[in-house]
């Protein structure tokens, strides 16, 4: 089991830890997370949080974790100086992305800094699927594994877009770590 100790080596009354996802349930089963329903009620978590987030913070119907942030990996990091040098604008669509990528490449900048580890490829693929197909398609194809969505023209477009994104990485990308 899990045992949290204070400075004196004995059990502690209070502790904080960054835990998320299924780990919240595991820690709660160990009995080391406090009931936070009073705080949740006072701060109106049930009204403010999406149900999926609220459910993940609860164990047996009680809040046992606080909603500190929601982290996504589908961010686009851009270098404004490189865009300025290339005469490109920050994209908001995939079509704009490819126009900008072409301009960056012509200006001598590698448009997509990307390693080739599996998790990086899948993260990029997820972002493309969401951007090309939208939230409903993403959920059907990648969460529910709906055969119709997986074999659809939208998935064909996702795959073609992903393949095109990869052409804007450098040849040394495969296997490179993210940092």
Residue ranges, per PLM feature:
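Short helix-initiation/N-cap motifs at beta->coil->alpha
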Residues: 1-2, 94-99, 174-179
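Extracytoplasmic/periplasmic solute-binding protein
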Residues: 59-68, 74, 98-147
């Amino acid at each position: 089991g899990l045992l949290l100790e204070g400075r004196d080596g004995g059990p502690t009354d209070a502790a904080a830890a960054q835990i998320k996802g299924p780990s919240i349930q595991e820690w709660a089963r160990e009995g080391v997370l406090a009931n936070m329903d009073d705080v949740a009620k006072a701060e109106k978590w049930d009204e403010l949080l999406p149900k999926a987030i609220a459910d993940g913070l609860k164990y047996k119907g009680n809040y046992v974790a606080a909603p500190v942030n929601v982290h996504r990996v589908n961010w686009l990091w851009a270098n404004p100086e490189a865009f300025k040098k290339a005469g490109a604008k920050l994209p908001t669509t995939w079509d704009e992305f490819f126009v900008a990528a072409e301009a960056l490449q012509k200006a001598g900048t590698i448009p997509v800094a990307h390693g080739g580890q599996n998790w990086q490829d899948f993260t990029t693929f997820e972002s493309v699927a969401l951007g090309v197909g939208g939230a409903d398609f993403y959920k059907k194809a990648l969460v529910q594994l709906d055969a119709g969505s997986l074999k659809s023209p939208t998935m064909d477009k996702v795959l073609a877009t992903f393949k095109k994104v990869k052409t804007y990485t450098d040849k040394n990308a495969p296997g490179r770590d993210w940092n």
